[in-house]
Amino acid sequence: MVACTPPPRPPPTPPVNPRTLRHLFNFWPPFLATGVHVSHISSDWRHARVELRMRPWNRNYVGTHFGGSLFSMTDPFWMIMVMQCLGRDYIVWDKAAEIEFVKPGKGTVQVQFKLDQAVLDELTEATASGQKVLRWFPMDVVDAQGDVVARLRKQLYVRRKRKAGGSDSQDAAVHP
């Protein structure tokens, strides 16, 4: 009897570096068309700065920033930053999001993402036994004067990857 062996797995895709990802985002059609510009992603994935520039084609009916653009400028960054910092042993997904429009946005607005070691330690500890964690990350979109235009929260699902043959009984969520 001949044993059937599975074909070898392709090598994992090498992780992209922050500088390359920043350039890719700036030419990504959804960001390019809406005026979103990623101005900085730190080399350690702990900080990012994103701007939304007012353009004739991205104004809403009353001449201010379209709310969907304010929301989309914040979309992938927390997930990517946490995923890159925790590494390949973790699953990280966007789970939920909330936005509160505080005042009309005009001109260039920006949002900053800062991920500190304490948050990463908290996530690592909370997922050590294989449980999923649902963690909220707040951020403010501000105008050139520093006034808050919108307050947002993104919820991430974070879980340590199961080893082969693991059970699905570890789905109780921890909410830090």
Whereabouts are the PLM-identified features?
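Non-catalytic linker/capping segments at the edges of enzyme domains
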Residues: 1-51, 167-176
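HotDog/MaoC-like acyl-thioester-processing domains
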Residues: 4-10, 15, 105-106, 116-176
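Short structured motifs
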Residues: 33-38, 95-101, 122-124
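A generic structural signal for short beta-strands and their flanking turns/coil linkers
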Residues: 34, 46-48, 93-97, 107-111, ...
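Residues located in well-ordered beta-strands
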Residues: 37, 98-100, 112-114, 140, ...
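Short, charged/polar surface micro-motifs in flexible loops or helix N-caps
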Residues: 44, 55-58, 76-78, 117-120
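Hot-dog-fold acyl-thioester-processing enzymes
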Residues: 57-77, 91
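Hydrophobic beta-strand-centered segment that forms part of the acyl-chain substrate-binding groove
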Residues: 81-118
